[in-house]
Amino acid sequence: MSDGDTNGPTGPIDRRMLEALVCPMTQAPLSYDAEKQELISKAAHLAYPIRGGIPIMLEEEARKLD
């Protein structure tokens, strides 16, 4: 495992990839919630799931945040 990896329940997630991703709705930066395996867009109030180490960046797959 390299220094740029973050462990999730399905294996390492490349931190450089996470830093390069932005919210598809707002183009705002995302934060990583390792416990829930989600990428959080505070600007859009959405949480995008990470499944099998792959971020699912589709609005219809995202969970709305309160």
Swiss-Prot record:
Cross-referenced PANTHER family: PROTEIN PREY, MITOCHONDRIAL (PTHR33505:SF4), ZGC:162634 (PTHR33505)
GO cellular component, one term: cytosol
Pfam family, one: Trm112p
Family the UniProt entry places it in: Belongs to the UPF0434 family.
InterPro entries xrefs: Trm112-like
Name the record gives this protein: UPF0434 protein Jann_0424
HAMAP family found in the cross-reference section: UPF0434
Organism: Jannaschia sp. (strain CCS1)
